[in-house]
Amino acid sequence: MQDFLALTLQGEQPATREGKQANFSWRWLGEGLLECTPHAQYDKAVVLSAGVHGNETAPIELLSHLCTDLFAGRLKLAVRLLLVLGNPYAMRQGKRYVHDDVNRMFCGGYKNLPVTEESKRAEVLEQTVATFFQESSSQAKRYHYDLHTAIRASLLPTFALFPYQTHSYDADLTASLEAADLDALVYHNAVGKTFTHFTSENFKAASATLELGKALPFGQNDLSQFASIDEVIRNVVSEQALPVRNKPKIRVFQVSDSLIKKDEEFHMNLSAEAPNFSTFTKGEIIATQPSGNYVVEQDQVWILFPNPNVKIGLRAGLVLTETI
C-alpha cells in the first residue's frame, strides 16, 4: 500500500486496491477511504477521520503517519479500522471547504444543498461508514474520533465535542479523551448535521469531534504539539493501556443555547480575533440584531465558535455553561 495521504492529494488509486499484511487485511474503498481488518478476533470497530475541513492539516498528517506505521509493522492493529480523509477536494486547494461546510451536511443535510463535489462526498462518507459498521462484528463496540483544528485561538486550546444523544455516553471514550490531555469536554444540547452526530445517531457509535489547535498548511505543523492525542489514538487502535493524564482535571461544559443570525444587521460584542471560550457575565449583551438582542441570563457563559459572518439562519456561535 503506497502513501495514503499522497495518493489522496494526487487523486490517484493504489496499484492494488486490497491486500494482506502480517496481521491484517486492507481494502482501498475509494479516495481517502481505507479499511483495515485484523486477522485475529476484534471487539471494536473504530472510525478515525480527519480533513472534513480541508485546511485542517495536522490531524490529516497524524492519520497518515499512523497508517504508514500500521503497514510498516511498527504499530499492531487490534481493532477493525476505517481511516477517512474527509474532503480531498478542499484538501487539494488548501481550503476549509470550497462550496459549503461538509460538517453541516450529514444526517441527509446534503440533500438540501446544490449538488457539488462536497455534497456528493458527504453522501459517500455516510454510505461508507454505514457499510463499515454493518459489516463489522455485531459484538464489536463502535467508536468514531473526528479530528479537527480550529480557525481561531482558544483559551482552552484542545477540547472535544460530544454530539447530542439520548443513550448514555461511553466511559471508555471519555477516558481516552482525558488521557489525551484535552482541556475541556463540551456536550451538545440539540441534534446536528455533523459527522459525529451521524455516527452516534444512526449506529450508536461512541463519537466525539476533537479540536486540536490551529489550522496550518501541510508541512508547517509541529506535530510534537499533538503527541498526547497521537499516543492515545495509537493505543486505541492497538488496544494498549491509555497513558496517565498529565494536566489538571478536564473541564466540562454544556451547550445552553445557540446564537442564530436572523438578520443581515447582526453584530457580536467580540473582536474578530476573540478566542474560543471568551466569557460574558449576567446582563451583558453577546449579540445585537433588529429581531432581538442576546442578553446573558446566567452568572457566566462561555462562547464557542463565534462567527458573525455566517449566512442568515445559521448558527453564529454556541453559548456554554460550565458543569461543576
Curated annotation (Swiss-Prot):
Protein family membership: Belongs to the AspA/AstE family. Succinylglutamate desuccinylase subfamily.
Pathway assignment: Amino-acid degradation; L-arginine degradation via AST pathway; L-glutamate and succinate from L-arginine: step 5/5
Reaction equation(s) it catalyzes: N-succinyl-L-glutamate + H2O = L-glutamate + succinate
EC number(s) recorded for this UniProt protein: 3.5.1.96
Name assigned to this protein: Succinylglutamate desuccinylase
Known role: Transforms N(2)-succinylglutamate into succinate and glutamate.
CC cofactor note: Binds 1 zinc ion per subunit.
Residues annotated for Zn(2+) binding in this entry: H53, E56, H148
Annotated active site: E211
Top-tier EC class: hydrolase
Pfam families, per database record: AstE_AspA_cat (PF24827), AstE_AspA_hybrid (PF04952)
Record keyword Hydrolase present: yes
UniProt xrefs under HAMAP family: Arg_catab_AstE (MF_00767)
Single GO MF descriptor: hydrolase activity, acting on ester bonds
GO BP: any one term: arginine catabolic process to succinate
Cofactor(s) needed for function: Zn(2+)
Top-level taxonomic group: Bacteria
Keyword Ribonucleoprotein recorded: no
Keywords from the UniProt entry: Arginine metabolism, Hydrolase, Metal-binding, Zinc
